């Protein structure tokens, strides 16, 4: 719910998937429908078409926040919807150093994401994710089919092996702002970008980093 000003699920449901009727849109555009009721409407339209509603949470706002807001370290989407829905929650995680290196490539975060602030948020997120279950991004790039099968099983969804032929051209997704995904055309592990000794020291010296590795079941420190 915190990201509505940037990414609107109602707009996505209408424009990406054609789920909403004109009467639905009129009701939503009146501004009188609470967030949970809007999601319930989308879920109802999914059910009518034998589809399953999957919500991809933007946990950055809840646990890191910068540069948009200060985090409060709570899964606000889940807390907002728990009363109305029986949620199945699951997390995908990446090595915290690689995640930081990826974030700071984006001009929004470069020079605005101190290591200490970032690691506190990631550690708090990892504490939450231990309760939902998680899988590693690195496992997916190493063995896409087996890892995606695990994710589908956790979410009680059928596995579609045809995803390999379609993923690179799939555009109905937010956050895919950096070039290269469709150009590569295959799912593969990439080498870690050079960090330098100073960055490695800044991470390894912090208890939040070491605790996050434990919570996320990473056995290394700064190696990918």
Question: PLM features: what roles do these ranges have?
Answer:
Residues 38-42, 121-125, 147, 208, ...:
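Alpha-helical packing segments of well-folded alpha/beta enzyme cores
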Residues 222-224:
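C-terminal non-catalytic accessory extensions
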Residues 1-48, 56-58, 164-220:
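PAPS-dependent sulfotransferase catalytic core
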Residues 30, 139, 200-204:
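A general boundary/transition motif marking the beginning of the first structured unit of a protein
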Residues 49-162:
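PAPS-dependent sulfotransferase catalytic domain
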Residues 39-47, 129-131, 203, 212:
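Generic hydrophobic, helix-prone segments enriched in Leu/Val/Ile
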């Amino acid at each position: 719910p915190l990201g509505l000003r940037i990414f609107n699920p109602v707009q996505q449901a209408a424009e990406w998937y054609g789920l909403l009727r004109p009467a639905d849109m009129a009701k939503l555009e009146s501004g009188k429908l609470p967030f949970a009721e809007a999601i319930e409407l989308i879920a109802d339209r999914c059910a009518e078409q034998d589809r399953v509603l999957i919500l991809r949470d933007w946990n950055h706002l809840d646990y890191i926040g910068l540069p948009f807001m200060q985090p409060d370290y709570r899964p606000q989407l889940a807390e907002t919807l728990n009363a109305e829905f029986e949620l199945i929650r699951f997390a995908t995680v990446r090595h915290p150093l690689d995640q930081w290196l990826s974030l700071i490539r984006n001009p929004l975060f470069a020079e605005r994401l101190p290591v200490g602030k970032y690691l506190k948020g990631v550690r708090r997120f990892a504490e939450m994710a231990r309760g939902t279950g998680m899988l590693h991004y690195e496992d997916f790039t190493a063995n896409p089919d087996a890892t995606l099968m695990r994710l589908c099983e956790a979410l009680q969804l059928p596995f579609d092996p045809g995803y390999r032929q379609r993923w690179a051209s799939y555009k109905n997704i937010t956050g895919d702002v950096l070039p290269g995904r469709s150009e590569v055309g295959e799912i593969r592990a990439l080498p870690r970008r050079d960090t330098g000794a100073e960055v490695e020291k800044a991470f390894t010296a912090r208890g939040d980093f070491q605790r996050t590795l434990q919570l996320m079941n990473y056995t290394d420190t700064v190696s990918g």
